[in-house]
Amino acid sequence: VTRTFGARNDNELFLDHFLNFFEDQFFPYLRENGIGTIIHLGDFFDRRKYVNVNTLNQVRKRFLSHLDGFKFHCILGNHDTYYRSTNEVNSLKEILGDRYSSFILHEEPATLDLAGLSVALVPWINKKNREDFLNFVKTCKASILMGHFEINGYEVIPGLKFRDGLDARLFSRFDSVYSGHFHAKQSKENIHYFGTPYQITFSDANLRKGFHVLDTETGKFEFVENKDRMFHVFVYDENEQLNKEDFRNKYVKIMVDRRSGRSNNGVDLLIDELNSLPVANLTVVELEDEKEENEEKIDLQKDTLTIISEEIDRMGINNSEKLKKIINELYVESLNI
């Protein structure tokens, strides 16, 4: 699992959504299947400078209290560290430290023996530790490597591939490499990004979220999908039967197609019903006939960043990837304002 608490500016609705996932799906699955070891691949808390007191209180009551009986290995992600250039000052050491016997913090690279399977862990790589950490990657004898990596060619968000990071060839000696950091679940060759365990923005609406279970006999992971979605996008169809309870306290976007000639008479009633649940946020987008034949069509089911990224590609400007990276960073930062 990776990237857990404090996203969306410590919004209490999102915090409750995150914690419900662990209480209702994650921990019950582990207990039912006799799993005793948990590995967290970084970004336990979202904010590098401080932790919201209510977030910490709820995490202590509803997450950390469930760790009894488990071994919880956690490496540092970039959001866990106060400075970008060193891991020395980090929230996990300062706040959690040795208060929980089940909680095992890895500030340095380490190798675990999981029922005979050798698994190497590498925390966030920065200027201060780069040489030592990369030397560990080049020389450790584990067949599986896990970390919090920025690897070239993998998507930060859909359509935006990372540049100026680590060369993927550095990891070719491992059977499998698993990483936190990037939000979208993705795989290429022997490298796999787990992605976030739950939806955080509308860009996640059509992405599969969840956690991964390691089979120590085969060295392979099984994906366990998180069935609880925070974001819902659909085209209104008065003949479709909706379970409106699925939308309670969720973010909903309804696309009303005025171009098809179909009846949309019931949309106002649906909006009233959803608001009375209530939903956390409701957006209605009406798709009208184009006024001009040459007017460009925009897929409004796509998220903001994907639309911007595609527009940058069409513009054919120099350093397009650098511009996408800047816009992505500004967008992510805006979510925490």
Where would I find each of the regions flagged by the language model?
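Hydrophobic/aromatic residues located in beta-strands of well-ordered beta-sheets
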Residues: 38, 72-74, 119, 143, ...
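Conserved beta-sheet core of the metallophosphoesterase superfamily
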Residues: 151-152, 157-222
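Short, conserved loop/helix-junction motifs that constitute active-site signature segments
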Residues: 64-68, 136-140, 168-173, 245-247
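Conserved catalytic scaffold of divalent metal-dependent phosphoesterases
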Residues: 59, 80-169
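Divalent metal-coordination and catalytic microenvironments
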Residues: 38, 43, 59, 77, ...
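Core catalytic region of metal-dependent phosphoesterases/phosphodiesterases
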Residues: 4-111, 170-174
